[in-house]
Amino acid sequence: ERIGNGKVYGIDYSALCIKHSKAQNRKNILCNKVKIVLASVSSLPFEDCSFDVVIAVETYYFWPDKLNDLKEIYRVLKQNGRIMLVFEMLKTPEEPDKWKAVEDKVGIKTVTEEEIREMLAKAGFEDIETHKKDGTTWLCAIGVKK
């Protein structure tokens, strides 16, 4: 309802997650409002300048080549398109080792707000904004393809 005549695409590199997503979104898939695709952020199966918005929630830590993956998202965004990255596990100066146990167990690396801003800029994004949720490490980073 909220997307009007638009369409939402979901991607994941896990076949199990794709199966779950298709089950959860069955109605909207049948109405051709949602399409779920098995793919990697490193090689998105979409034409250049295809999307108005790309949103990634709690996935950045797992990307194999963060700079190139951000450039791949930049490629599929339309001019003035936006990327939105959402993080819970944010490394902060106050608690630099807060997520260390998770990093070690899962094999990921958390990043700081400044590192996220720098990577978005290196990938070509402009008008970069970051928004923190007070009292938490939640962060939303937004960049624009000009």
Predicted regions span which residues?
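A short acidic, Gly/Pro-enriched loop at the edge of an enzyme's catalytic core
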Residues: 42-54
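Core SAM-dependent methyltransferase catalytic element
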Residues: 123-146
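Class I SAM-dependent methyltransferase SAM/SAH-binding core
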Residues: 1-43
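A short glycine-rich, Lys/Arg-flanked "PGG" loop and its adjoining helix->strand segment in the class I
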Residues: 67-82
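Conserved class I S-adenosyl-L-methionine
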Residues: 82-113
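A short beta-strand submotif of the Rossmann-like class I SAM-dependent methyltransferase core
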Residues: 56-59
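Helix-to-beta-strand junctions that scaffold the AdoMet/dcAdoMet cofactor pocket
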Residues: 3, 30, 63-64, 77-79
